[in-house]
Amino acid sequence: MEEMEEELKCPVCGSFYREPIILPCSHNLCQACARNILVQTPESESPQSHRAAGSGVSDYDYLDLDKMSLYSEADSGYGSYGGFASAPTTPCQKSPNGVRVFPPAMPPPATHLSPALAPVPRNSCITCPQCHRSLILDDRGLRGFPKNRVLEGVIDRYQQSKAAALKCQLCEKAPKEATVMCEQCDVFYCDPCRLRCHPPRGPLAKHRLVPPAQGRVSRRLSPRKVSTCTDHELENHSMYCVQCKMPVCYQCLEEGKHSSHEVKALGAMWKLHKSQLSQALNGLSDRAKEAKEFLVQLRNMVQQIQENSVEFEACLVAQCDALIDALNRRKAQLLARVNKEHEHKLKVVRDQISHCTVKLRQTTGLMEYCLEVIKENDPSGFLQISDALIRRVHLTEDQWGKGTLTPRMTTDFDLSLDNSPLLQSIHQLDFVQVKASSPVPATPILQLEECCTHNNSATLSWKQPPLSTVPADGYILELDDGNGGQFREVYVGKETMCTVDGLHFNSTYNARVKAFNKTGVSPYSKTLVLQTSEVAWFAFDPGSAHSDIILSNDNLTVTCSSYDDRVVLGKTGFSKGIHYWELTVDRYDNHPDPAFGVARMDVMKDVMLGKDDKAWAMYVDNNRSWFMHNNSHTNRTEGGITKGATIGVLLDLNRKNLTFFINDEQQGPIAFDNVEGLFFPAVSLNRNVQVTLHTGLPVPDFYSSRASIA
């Protein structure tokens, strides 16, 4: 019953209703509280005064509207309009519910009479503090409102069940504890109110005062007062007016405004309304049960939210820590590359210092020797050696020619860390708000007519289905490893076309694509099978070649402008399969030593191929050849090259070896074993040599047969 307590309290005083009356809006008020919130309209602001003054529309025109509609709402004399607006010259105050309250015309009489029986000022109205609807009172004042005897009985039973102390019914502010009850007045008094309102003299001297507990018992045992008609106070209700929805007496039916209305027996309507209320309560009870279950669900959600929050925070911290760890690992890798570049630069500079020191010492020795020879006075002896000395001086001078006195390495580090994409990604790092109402994109469609392969590159194109209405934020393209292995992402972005380079030759790849948005990812498209070229077609790469290299014939023919060896690489790199290419010698003067083989992308370009650890090569003159890697010369083999000779290079990455051929004959044994990684075809030569590259060649038959036998 504790939840019912708010229903039993007056909205004005906040205490249990005392002598509650029913307003036309069906809300209840204490009689004393209703008296306190009466609003008196001054004569100067009455509608008649405004009309007499000839003024225009005012705030009190609402009163006219209500008086014109006194009988429009079931003859109740009840109208709806807003609160009054105060005039500058009229003293007033605002109550919390926005009702305008004027000072009473005279102080309330300090008598023993109930406040409801005191005279009501003229032009009074009352505003319901709950729905704020207003009513102009007639001559009966508050006596025109029926008393809610049922509510009184409910309050009595509730207070008895709570065994609460009885309160005085006449205290104007916070009611004090009652000390007596008058059986005749049926009112509980505290001592101050009893002395003020119920003095023991005159007619009141014959009243019997009893303790509050005894009075409560006698009140409960005494029959409840029967509700009387508000229009005929001496008559009890006997019938029920269906049109006005209120009990009426027989005089109302014979003489009053209900004479022409449909009426029914009071007992029958009492039972009918009780039945209707019970049925309505059943529905409300079901709703209350659902509300309790919903509250349990909400309380469980609070606990679940707490647990999910802790779990999500832990997951977020773990993800951020993983990003930090990955960044630290990448930092270590980049620092290792910087250190490697540092060591490489120092090695190159030190090697050049050593080389120049030796050559300078030789040059200085030759100069000193020539000066001493010039000092000799023996003409015949001088002429015997002068020609050779002159040639040596010119040759030495040529050796100090172009490029020799140029540093092979710059002091600057040609490395620039582009961290802007990562910073942008960090700034864009945010939570993805998944909306259940937003579906995932439709499955993309691969456009077969636009998909193709060239050499070891594949171009794929896709589109959204024509009738798709869900936009895609981007696409994810996946390829397997060419051996039927797991798929891996090769492109993520908004474009609908992508070219993938660096695939293996003579390999079969499977490709698929899916779309994504903030809600999730679509299913994969159908898998597309791609076949790369069986053999490689490529040319020399001018972008990575030394500046002294001269290319022609669509970058298939190469020579050099320097007497020193310079390196040029092919455009295509290999990391898998068997590959064969040839080079024909177009020009060969003064017996130089060109070198042929494979190299990494960062091989030294200003020395013979094989001088560093980034190249694997065979260098050859007109009589013999050598294999060279990391400046180590091995396997001298007889047989050289001349103009028109053909050099073949066979890179078998399946067996991880490199073999050379001259004029279709294998030159020496297998040159290098255990070669793996990414390799580019490479050549080093000087100005005395010109060669032409031939690609797209099948593996020699004899090698294929030997490989199949093995």
Swiss-Prot record:
Please indicate which superkingdom the organism of origin belongs to: Eukaryota
Note what the entry says on domains: The coiled coil domain mediates the interaction with the N-terminal t-SNARE domain of SNAP25.
Task: Tell me which residues bear Phosphoserine.
Answer: S44, S46, S49
Entry keyword Ubl conjugation: yes
Q: Which GO terms describe its biological process?
A: proteasome-mediated ubiquitin-dependent protein catabolic process; protein ubiquitination
What protein is this chain from?
E3 ubiquitin-protein ligase TRIM9
Name of encoding gene:
TRIM9
Cite the entry's keywords alphabetically. Cell projection, Coiled coil, Cytoplasm, Cytoplasmic vesicle, Cytoskeleton, Metal-binding, Phosphoprotein, Repeat, Synapse, Transferase, Ubl conjugation, Ubl conjugation pathway, Zinc, Zinc-finger
